[in-house]
Amino acid sequence: MKITVLVGGVGGARFLLGVQNLLGLGSFADGPSKHELTAVVNIGDDAWMHGVRICPDLDTCMYTLGGGIDPDRGWGHRNETWNAKEELAAYGVQPDWFGLGDRDLATHLVRSQMLRAGYPLSQVTEALCKRWQPGARLLPASDERSETHVVITDPTDGERRAIHFQEWWVRYRAKVPTHSFAYVGADQATAGPGVVEAIGDADIVLLAPSNPVVSIGPILQIPGIRGALRSTSAPVIGYSPIIAGKPLRGMADECLKVIGVESTSQAVGEFFGARAGTGLLDGWLVHEGDHAQIEGVKVKAVPLLMTDPEATAAMVRAGLDLAGVSL
């Protein structure tokens, strides 16, 4: 069984744990497995900060699957310290709203050194994963720059300007007047090595219940990926990130509002659309009690709370069942 999953950060990483639980991979393995898991990971959040390249979603997936994630925050290193952040603040270095943990900083330093030496992000990620042994192949959506920027009304002067997604998300917590998202560099990027093949060779492709606008959306903006999803012989099954009109974490509702999409399972399913038409989905899972009816898409209501890897594995199995795919 080959499963390919499109993911963002915290929620996507937890979803991957459920896939591993079902397949007996990674920390859930009790011997060799015939199954393969590939994650196509969002790079829209990536940015240069304090001279190092940060890749939040790649790192969150790597740390989570490798057992090094901070379990309370859901991101960053377990047992993190913040000495470097305190020293940077003492120097008055900007941006002061973005903190790099000491352990996390080591990852960014290694990545930045390799990037400056000419290695592409996909090879850098593969090298970093040798330490963490995530039990899955983590593929950046692209090796090229493709960043999510946000057009806001600047609260300091009332002028419109574009800022990096990290500033909108971390500094402003999405609480400034917001007008649109821009995927800078996406139109000039190409799908990362192995990405199109992972979609085409899969037995099933899953869209994790990550933020549809700033996690899954930036992946779909990269030329070649949407086409691969539409042409693959594998069924494409999506999971609603909205439960009872609200996202469980993050600010998906704020993002959806910006692009004029309601925070409902119905609306998000329609946002992705049916592959039978011009969209991507063959199946769409919504939380029990929620409802959706999308022409050309099989819809099923099941529990979608990722309370633990076992509960998440049940979600994954429900997706396989909806697609008629057997382990």
Curated annotation (Swiss-Prot):
It comes from the Bacteria. The keyword Repressor does not apply. It is an enzyme of class 2 (transferase). HAMAP family: CofD (MF_01257). Catalyzes the transfer of the phosphoenolpyruvate moiety from enoylpyruvoyl-2-diphospho-5'-guanosine (EPPG) to 7,8-didemethyl-8-hydroxy-5-deazariboflavin (FO) with the formation of dehydro coenzyme F420-0 and GMP. Homodimer. This is Phosphoenolpyruvate transferase. It comes from Mycolicibacterium smegmatis (strain ATCC 700084 / mc(2)155) (Mycobacterium smegmatis).
